UniProtKB/Swiss-Prot annotation:
Species: Pseudomonas fluorescens
Stated name of the protein: Malate synthase G
Positions bound to acetyl-CoA: 118, 125-126, 276, 313, 541
Catalytic activity: glyoxylate + acetyl-CoA + H2O = (S)-malate + CoA + H(+)
Residue ranges of coiled coil: none
Gene Ontology CC annotations of this record: cytosol
Length: 725
């Protein structure tokens, strides 16, 4: 049992109580008594409201289920269906026009466009890597991934392969010609770079000199002007740096001694307390809060072993250059950090209220992550985050404007507890639940003074799409979802509503994750679709991917693109409400088996590491051994998809169990190299992870909105108790 300490009307887990009093509070200007008294009141005032909002979710779902059951066997009538959703208050009248009025937003969010990382803050090494991914090597990203083909002798190999290196150099020179064109000639022919009279002078083959077509692109340099070691350029609001050192293995093969091009990459990072972590008790939550506190204080550090050597990884300092006018130019050396709190659903026993009930985890996250952020706000930090005095909190999985209003109220109450000016706490609204999508304008309006971000989370959104219409019939195959009418309308609608409510220049309009971290050539080809769609940020799975995705923001001027898109006809709510039902369900046995196996294998591969190792975000090989980033959102889709096919007789429970049991040894084989791994097969009945997977699928229709957290949390706690963790 967790040891608790009585504080006013709260029982606080001792590990959390000690962390707050001894680590988080000192230096904030707030006393422990103040904090706990304020937390007590916030929890007891707002927990009942939180509970009522969850009851409303269940009521809507029950009504929608009944409507579909009543109309079973009939052709779906979209007009009657929409009228029904309006009658019950699910689809609300459109909010009156307004403009968001958020103040004190950092440029990285309001006025720049670039990649966004999402990482589990529970893992200090990942958190530090992401924080430092504001700047990334283009050469490393190209050389070390499939972005550069291994054909024609360009294999990666163990040592440096000059053939491959030359391909990387050629790619980078082409980028320079595109992003910083010369007034005459090409970077391809450059033999030297220097600064003279505040301008870039480029020596070319043949002896001639050239300069930038637009001299304003030169921002600064490092080293002597006549022999700079770095040249800082700017294009589409993003910086990049030509690094020069002819003594390096790469530089000595380059005519101009260029050793790398450093990209300004992950402008922002979401430090995640939610879908990518496995945190089920006070001990887990303190790990999260301690890492976030370290990021806010600027002193997070981690011992890292690499190549037989151990070193301490810390947060990078700012970058300093000599400007063209001779004055110092200082650029942020780190990604601007958001923190993603959990949503409104779960409760946790890290704190118990006066009646002995677990408190809403989202309220706890809000209080603790905001408390930690004071250290960055008040100058205690050696690595300041926001330069405008804001704290950026992403709030996921909200259903409709009442829930957005509740978050707005919660943030106001937290500001009062922490003596923060009103609207210090900013909100990122995840548009990943159907009731938020169709009422998005009203959701933004409910937080119009705090909103700094809307983002389409198509993975969770697909899970909610399936669960909401669970009773309507069998859904299309999972891979076909991406081409269904609702999803394109949903993606466009988010941009349309964001632009019409004045988010440009104040907030990010974001797009979802590239889930295949090993397939960078495909990402380079495809993910340009996100800036073209009007998104000034989109999610990437790694610092390497951030450096490559940054190239897309040099190809697309997102703010100009948004101005074009603002003139188009708005996406249709009717299209968004189009249920992705299969037109016919006469799939072959092989097609059904493949669908089932693919889902089952992904579920098992993710759940086994969640339950057994407490790992909330994994690169899980799919059925074709392609590594996919899996988190709770992908688990929600896969489990709900099987549950839907089971509900409508496309598959039987016996088929589902047979697939799970057949896929378990496949997952075991894929994890054979992990010393900490515990096999799923053959003792299925006593394997907690396997039983969790079974429950998620077989009982999938009963999970609240199709969420996986209730089962995962219960089973992880069972595993920890059984194994003395």
């Amino acid at each position: 049992m967790t040891e608790h300490v009585q504080v006013g009307g709260l029982q606080v887990a001792k590990v959390l109580f000690d962390f707050v009093n001894n680590e988080a509070i000192p230096g904030t200007g707030i006393t422990a008594d103040q904090f706990w008294a304020g937390a007590d009141k916030v929890i007891h005032d707002l927990a009942p409201k939180n509970k009522a909002l969850l009851a409303k979710r269940d009521d809507f779902q029950a009504r929608i289920d009944t409507w579909h059951q009543t109309h079973a066997g009939q052709a779906h009538d979209p007009v009657a269906y929409k009228a029904f959703l309006q009658d019950i208050g699910y689809l609300l009248p459109e909010a009156a026009d307004f403009q968001a009025s958020t103040q004190n937003v950092d440029d990285e969010i309001a006025r720049m466009a670039g990649p966004q990382l999402v990482v589990p803050v529970m893992n200090a090494r990942f958190a530090l890597n992401a924080s430092n991914a504001r700047w990334g090597s283009l050469y490393d990203a190209l050389y070390g991934t499939d972005a550069i083909s291994e054909a024609d002798g360009a294999e990666k190999g163990k040592g440096y392969n000059k053939v491959r290196g030359d391909k990387v150099i050629a790619f980078a020179r082409a980028f320079l010609d595109e992003a910083a064109p010369l007034s005459a000639g090409s970077h391809v022919d450059s033999t030297g770079y220097k600064i003279a009279d505040g301008k870039l002078i480029v020596s070319l083959k043949g002896g001639s000199n050239s300069g930038l077509r637009d001299d304003a692109q030169l921002i600064g340099f490092q080293g002597p002007a006549a022999q700079p070691i770095a040249i800082l350029l700017k294009h589409n609001g993003l910086h990049f740096e030509i690094q020069i050192d002819a003594s390096t293995p790469v530089g000595q093969t380059d005519a101009a001694g260029v050793k790398d091009v450093l990209m300004e990459a992950a402008l922002t990072t979401i430090m995640d307390c939610e879908d990518s972590v496995a945190a089920v008790d006070a001990d887990d939550k303190v790990v999260i809060y301690r890492n976030w506190l370290g990021l806010m204080k600027g002193d997070l550090a981690e011992e890292v072993a690499k190549g037989g050597k151990t070193f301490t990884r810390t947060m990078n300092p700012d970058r300093v250059y000599t400007g063209v006018d001779g004055q110092d130019v200082t650029l942020h050396g780190r990604s601007l950090l958001f923190v993603r709190n959990v949503g409104h659903l779960m409760t946790i026993d890290a704190i118990l209220d006066k009646a002995g009930n677990e408190v809403p985890e989202g309220i706890l996250d809000g209080l603790l992550t905001s408390l930690a952020a004071i250290h960055s706000l008040n100058g205690n930090s050696s690595r300041k985050n926001s330069r405008t005095g804001s704290v950026y909190i992403v709030k996921p999985k909200m259903h409709g404007p009442e829930e957005a209003a509740f978050t707005n109220e919660l943030f106001g109450r937290i500001e009062d507890v922490l003596n923060l000016p009103r609207n210090t706490l900013k909100v990122g609204i995840m548009d990943e639940e159907r009731r938020t999508t169709v009422n998005l304008k009203a959701c933004i309006k409910a937080a119009s003074e705090r909103v700094v971000f809307i983002n389409t989370g198509f993975l969770d959104r697909t899970g909610d799409e399936i669960h909401t219409s669970m009773e309507a019939g069998a859904m299309v195959r999972k891979a076909a979802m991406k081409t269904e009418k609702w999803i394109g309308a949903y993606e466009n609608w988010n941009v349309d509503i964001g632009l019409s409510t004045g988010l440009q220049g104040r907030a990010q309009i974001g797009k979802g994750m590239w889930a295949m971290p090993d397939l960078m050539a495909a990402m380079l080809e495809q993910k340009i679709a996100h800036p073209l769609a009007g998104a000034n940020t989109a999610w990437v799975p790694s610092p390497t991917a951030a450096a490559l995705h940054a190239l897309h923001y040099h190809k697309v001027d997102v703010f100009a693109r948004q101005a074009e898109l603002a003139k188009r006809e708005r996406a249709s709510v009717d299209d968004i409400l189009t249920i992705p039902l299969a037109k016919n369900t006469d799939w072959s046995e092989e097609e059904i088996r493949n669908e089932l196996d693919n889902n089952a294998q992904g579920i098992l591969g993710y759940v086994v590491r969640w339950i057994d190792q407490g790992v909330g975000c994994s690169k899980v090989p799919d059925i074709n051994d392609v590594g996919l980033m899996e988190d709770r959102a992908t688990l929600r889709i896969s489990s709900q998809h099987i549950a839907n096919w089971l509900r409508h007789g496309v598959v039987t429970q016996d088929q589902v169990m047979e697939s799970l049991k057949r896929m378990a040894p496949v997952v075991d084989r894929q994890n054979a190299g992990d010393a900490l791994y515990r096999p799923l097969a053959p003792d299925f009945d006593s394997n907690i992870a396997f039983q969790a997977a079974v429950e998620l699928v077989i009982e999938g229709t009963k999970q609240p909105n199709g969420y996986t957290e209730p089962v995962l949390h219960r089973k992880r706690r069972e595993f920890k108790a059984k194994n003395g963790l």
